């Protein structure tokens, strides 16, 4: 079973903002457009209260390593360049800056957020209106929002393609679960192979994959007509999610990093190296605002070229430890 990443939107609350601020779903097609929309949402929500600098975040993200790896691919970099099982870091400064400017900067300024364990949790509490996550996470999208005041209302889901970097190559992540045949008696290996052949037949793989919220593993089965013809019952959320997911798989170059020694640990550097810093610095900004500083004063230290450079050198040094 396979999956990719999509953008999941609380369309109910988005519509009120979109109408008031003259923004559209099309604005969320690029990371730059998403960042600009998030700034507008922060300002729009900030203006609804008398307190200064208390706007809300529009967006959050699961799987930060995917943001880094796939975003770099879109911009022409392969961060983990692997040959013969050995990895070389290839993380150009200008690519790193685009990633920084479209995650760290909006996060520190309160336009992006990550509070719950998963971003679908942040949708449920109203902390964000949209998130990028696995296509399989559609089953976890909440039907209601309940805020800190215990006020609750129903919401509807709109599924969109994951935003990509403006002017970059169309690249999407490929991920999911696989199977292997382990060493065994010849008869057992042959039986395992026969099972796998049966399992990946379109009719069987569609039933298993789609029924569990994933995508089929063959090109033939990754077709909405094939999926609809399978007879599976799909609710509106799953049908729109599968439609966008299938379009994503068929309309992008799919990317997954090659394996190398220490690859899991190196991936963790990308998973947490930007997001943890952003969360810690946003907390500092909020403390400073609570003490009376303006948002501009509280954020200034973190928005300099020098601050980016320190992070860039640090993450490159950490990644270099896993080079072959």
Q: How should each PLM-predicted stretch be described?
A:
Residues 1-6, 15, 154-163:
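Hinge/lid segment of periplasmic solute-binding proteins
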Residues 129-134, 139-141:
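Paired acidic/hydrophobic, glycine-rich loop segments that form the ligand-binding mouth/hinge
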Residues 246-324:
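Conserved C-terminal helix/tail region of periplasmic/extracytoplasmic solute-binding proteins
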Residues 108-109, 147-220, 253:
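Extracytoplasmic/periplasmic substrate-recognition and gating elements
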Residues 1-5, 15, 32-88:
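Extracytoplasmic/periplasmic solute-binding protein
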Residues 24-26, 77-98, 147-152, 164-170, ...:
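Short, solvent-exposed loop/beta-turn-alpha elements that line the ligand-binding surface or hinge
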Residues 35-42, 82-116, 162:
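Glycine-centered hinge/linker elements that transmit conformational signals in sensory
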């Amino acid at each position: 079973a396979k999956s990719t990443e999509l953008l999941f939107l609380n369309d109910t609350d988005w519509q009120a903002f979109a109408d008031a601020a003259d923004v559209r779903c099309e604005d969320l097609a690029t990371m730059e457009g998403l960042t600009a929309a998030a700034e507008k949402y922060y300002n729009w929500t900030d203006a609804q209260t008398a307190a200064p600098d208390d706007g809300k975040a529009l967006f959050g993200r699961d799987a930060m390593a995917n943001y880094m790896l796939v975003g770099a691919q879109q911009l022409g970099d392969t961060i983990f360049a692997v040959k013969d099982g050995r990895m070389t870091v290839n993380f150009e400064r200008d690519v790193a800056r685009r990633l920084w400017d479209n995650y760290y900067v909006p996060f520190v300024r309160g336009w992006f957020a990550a509070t719950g364990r998963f971003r679908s949790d942040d949708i449920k509490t109203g902390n964000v209106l949209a998130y990028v996550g696995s296509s399989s996470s559609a089953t976890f999208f909440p039907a209601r929002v309940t805020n800190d005041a215990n006020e609750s209302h129903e919401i509807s889901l709109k599924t969109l393609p994951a935003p990509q970097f403006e002017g970059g190559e169309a690249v999407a992540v490929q991920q999911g679960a696989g199977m292997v045949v382990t060493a065994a008696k010849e008869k057992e290996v042959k039986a395992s192979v026969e099972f796998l052949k049966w399992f990946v037949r379109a009719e069987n793989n569609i039933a298993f994959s789609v029924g569990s919220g994933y995508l089929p593993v063959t090109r033939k089965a990754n077709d909405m007509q094939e999926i609809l013809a399978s007879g599976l019952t799909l609710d509106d959320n799953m049908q729109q999610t599968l439609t966008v997911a299938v379009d994503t798989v068929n309309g992008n170059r799919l990317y997954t990093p090659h394996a190398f020694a220490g690859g899991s640990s190196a991936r963790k550097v990308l998973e947490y190296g930007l997001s943890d810093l952003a969360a810690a610095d946003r907390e500092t900004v909020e403390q400073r605002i609570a003490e009376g500083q303006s948002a501009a004063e509280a954020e200034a230290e973190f928005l300099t070229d020098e601050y980016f450079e320190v992070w860039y050198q640090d993450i490159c040094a950490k990644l270099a430890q896993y080079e072959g």
